[in-house]
């Protein structure tokens, strides 16, 4: 096991014995112990009472965080003609068709969000095994298969976050940067939790939100009081 740095030891001591904190208190603790040389991302993990292997228990959705993510999101768009021009004008870094497909197939994935016009989906569908596991596959349910390319690109760059339950029923996302003010991070966290609550699938039984935790990129995690997140159901 790698030896912990003094900062990591100090952070673990600060978190020891603390759990089920109010959102603002937890955010303050995470911010105080985000000691990396870069601006760490504040990440949220929600443990849900679902089994995503069943179609009626899949949790998927999108939310625009009120204070943005603090991240420079790189967008790729599958489109041709006027829609390709529209994507470029909206700020998409990568725009293409067959050429973009070949780039992705070669293993070069230099984007955080992938958008496609509906007519491009037969082409994009060939990339399912590459984009799917990375949660990059365009999907009409989250607005990334659309003719309104301009709006989709602007949303991706304006603080929109996609989420999807993993096999164990856990949803992960970045909800801001450690440099954000406590109040702004708290607003983002509550907005994210609310969106996941609204995405509750019809097949979910029993307790839906079991646990909510936050951490910084390099720091320990702490669980939140569900009542303070408005997650209790």
From Swiss-Prot:
BP-aspect Gene Ontology terms: regulation of translation; translation
Superkingdom to which the source organism belongs: Bacteria
Pfam family, one: Ribosomal_L1
GO molecular function: rRNA binding; structural constituent of ribosome; tRNA binding
GO cellular component annotations of the record: cytosolic large ribosomal subunit
InterPro entries: Ribosom_uL1_bac-type, Ribosomal_uL1, Ribosomal_uL1-like, Ribosomal_uL1/biogenesis, Ribosomal_uL1_3-a/b-sand, Ribosomal_uL1_CS
Keyword list, A-Z: Repressor, Ribonucleoprotein, Ribosomal protein, RNA-binding, rRNA-binding, Translation regulation, tRNA-binding
Gene3D superfamilies the record matches: 3.30.190.20, 3.40.50.790
PANTHER family membership: 54S RIBOSOMAL PROTEIN L1, MITOCHONDRIAL, LARGE RIBOSOMAL SUBUNIT PROTEIN UL1M
Subunit structure: Part of the 50S ribosomal subunit.
HAMAP family named among the record's database cross-references: Ribosomal_uL1_B
Function: Binds directly to 23S rRNA. The L1 stalk is quite mobile in the ribosome, and is involved in E site tRNA release.
Protein family (similarity comment): Belongs to the universal ribosomal protein uL1 family.
Descriptive protein name: Large ribosomal subunit protein uL1
Organism, as annotated: Paracoccus denitrificans (strain Pd 1222)
